[in-house]
From Swiss-Prot:
Subunit text: Monomer.
Domain of life of the native organism: Bacteria
GO-annotated molecular function: ATP binding; glutamine-tRNA ligase activity
CDD domains per UniProt: GlnRS_core (cd00807)
Name assigned to this protein: Glutamine--tRNA ligase
Keyword annotations from UniProtKB, A to Z: Aminoacyl-tRNA synthetase, ATP-binding, Cytoplasm, Ligase, Nucleotide-binding, Protein biosynthesis
One Pfam match: tRNA-synt_1c_C2
GO terms (BP aspect): glutaminyl-tRNA aminoacylation; glutamyl-tRNA aminoacylation
Reaction equation(s) it catalyzes: tRNA(Gln) + L-glutamine + ATP = L-glutaminyl-tRNA(Gln) + AMP + diphosphate
Family: Belongs to the class-I aminoacyl-tRNA synthetase family.
Keyword Nucleotide-binding on entry: yes
Length: 553
């Protein structure tokens, strides 16, 4: 995966190929239009890779446009985080960042054009009445009593809306289409509503705000977008997208294409539910390493290359499906296996004394940073009379399948000597506090001269040089594959999604670990220093992914 990423093929790219071949378009222009009301998640990453990837591969452009038509739910914090995420994923947008609010004046003018054409009217039914009049999937809606107002009256009332003459909910502007349409979205949809809220871009200039379906298509047209790509839930909305553009004086008419959204096992993609996890303190924030957000994945140690590869592998189709979490984990595992430098860390330390090793001797062992990349260089790792091994790597008694250290038996220390367990020291409760071993000083980097075979290999850290650290072992946030289907999704939280190891012992080279840069802790997994919690005084490392998939559900 460190090699050049392959160029994917999918039905949208086939459409683009046909459009270019036929001369329908001479170039390609796409856009990524998030609403700044939350942090981006892995589902958005799929859309980013699709839209920006198309622009890159066809030498076209991709705009970053914030769909900022609801000032109540939006925040500059989200605007900034989204820009960081897009850039982290390896993409750059065309020109300046754009906002739907950049077009509020034009959108207002197009709304007036629809009124003048008798295609929009000011509605004074309540929201509940509008829902009642809309009908159902099997029953046609009925016309509003305000539907046949004159153009002059509608213009005056819309101006009154704009000037703050109505309270929120007292009036809205609706498109006049067909209350008997078999598509609910075409039953006179609301295209403007009143909101007395300060906007993060326009301040208090407006108290009326356009709806998404009205804004989106016009913004696409104003920007000259050729292929407007969105997820399948907007498939019916394409009819409204086309209706708006067909009925206003705008030369460009983009086309909308839909693909299936990403559904990932053991995760949720609803921004509302993700926000609930944050506001109710279930997680530590939008960038909690258990969250499926781009910032959460980054903090956990995921690489942009792994995320892009995942998006390439799952592909772009029109069929809804759910992707196994192991598919995402496989991508980061493969990527880090190739690139991550190795280090040794003992998560559950057991003190070991090598009784025949000189007390005042410290050896600096040259250990390769990566077994398959010589150019990654070497590091010096201290070795001394007292070391730590993992408690799970020693047993007083064990069967033949146990290949680690057993009382009276030998094991090799990774990159170092063969040692033999001689005796233990225990506390009053019978817990082993110290393991005493002998060390074969003739086996550093070589096999025993007498030809005896020692199969087991374990990792270690020099005790006087060890870096004390907190290690956070992350697992899947939910205990069921489809938490979104549960009546109460919070009841499916995995209580073991975070386990904190407070006193891990790490080799000293990790003292300078950069946040979010992953290492392979040999025999343990891939870990990175936490970007928020880790410090020189108290290092904190996050588990990115285990060496192999051990999830049993």
């Amino acid at each position: 995966m460190t090699q050049a990423e392959h160029r994917p093929t999918n039905f949208i790219r086939q459409i683009i190929d046909e459009d270019l071949a036929s001369g329908k378009h001479s170039s390609v222009a796409t856009r990524f239009p998030p609403e700044p009301n939350g942090y981006l998640h892995i589902g958005h990453a799929k859309s980013i890779c699709l839209n920006f990837g198309i622009a890159r591969d066809y030498q076209g452009t991709c705009n970053l446009r914030f769909d900022d038509t609801n000032p109540v739910k939006e925040d500059v914090e989200y605007v900034e985080s989204i820009q960081r995420d897009v850039q982290w994923l390896g993409f750059e947008w065309n020109g300046a960042v754009r906002y739907s609010s950049d077009y509020f004046d034009q959108l207002h003018a197009y709304a007036i054009e629809l009124i003048n054409k008798g295609l929009a009217y000011v509605e004074e039914l309540t929201a509940e009445q509008i829902r009642e009049y809309r009908g159902t999937l099997t029953q046609a809606g009925k016309n509003s009593p305000f539907r046949d107002r004159s153009v002059e009256e509608n213009l005056a009332l819309f101006e009154k809306m704009k000037d703050g003459g109505f309270k929120e909910g007292e009036a809205c502007l609706r498109a006049k289409i067909d209350m008997a349409s078999s598509f609910m979205v075409m039953r006179d949809p609301v295209i403007y509503r009143i909101k007395f809220a300060e906007h993060h871009q326009t301040g208090n200039k407006w108290c009326i705000y356009p709806m998404y379906d009205f804004t989106h298509c016009i913004s696409d047209a104003l920007e000259g977008i050729t292929h407007s790509i969105c997820t399948l839930e907007f498939q019916d909305n394409r009819r409204l997208y086309d209706w708006v553009l067909d009925n206003i004086s705008i030369p460009c008419h983009p086309r909308q294409y839909e693909f299936s959204r990403l559904n990932l096992e053991y995760a949720i993609m609803s921004k509302r539910k993700l926000n609930q996890l944050v506001t109710e303190g279930v997680v530590e924030g939008w960038d909690d390493p258990r969250m499926p957000t781009v910032s959460g994945l980054r903090r956990r140690g995921y690489t942009p290359e792994a995320v892009r590869e995942f998006c390439n592998r799952i592909g772009v189709t029109k069929q809804d499906n759910t992707v196994e979490m192991s598919a995402l984990e496989s991508c980061i595992r493969e990527d880090l296996n190739e690139r991550a430098p190795r280090a040794m860390a003992v998560l559950d330390p057991l003190r070991v004394v090598l009784e025949n090793y000189p007390e005042d001797l410290v050896e600096e062992l040259n250990i390769p940073n990566h077994p398959n990349i010589p150019e990654a260089g070497e590091r010096l790792v201290p070795f001394s009379r007292e070391i730590y091994i993992d408690r799970a790597d020693f047993r007083e008694e064990a069967n033949k399948q146990y290949k680690r250290l057993v009382m009276g038996k030998e094991v090799r220390l990774r990159h170092a000597y063969i040692i033999k367990a001689e005796r233990v020291e225990k506390d009053a409760e019978g817990n082993i506090t110290t393991l005493y071993c002998s060390c074969d000083r003739d086996t550093l980097g070589t096999n025993p001269a007498d030809g005896r075979k020692v199969k087991g290999v374990i990792h270690w850290v020099s005790a006087p040089h060890a870096l004390d650290a907190e290690v956070r072992l992350y697992d899947r946030l939910f205990s069921v594959a489809n938490p979104g289907a549960a009546e109460d999704f919070l009841s499916t939280i995995n209580p073991q999604s975070l386990r904190i190891v407070p006193h891990a012992k790490l080799e000293p080279s990790l003292r300078d670990a950069k946040p979010e840069f992953a290492y392979q802790f040999e025999r343990e997994g891939y870990f990175c220093a936490d970007s928020k919690l880790s410090s020189a005084e108290k290092p904190v490392f996050n588990l990115t992914v285990a060496l192999r998939d051990t999830w049993v559900g």
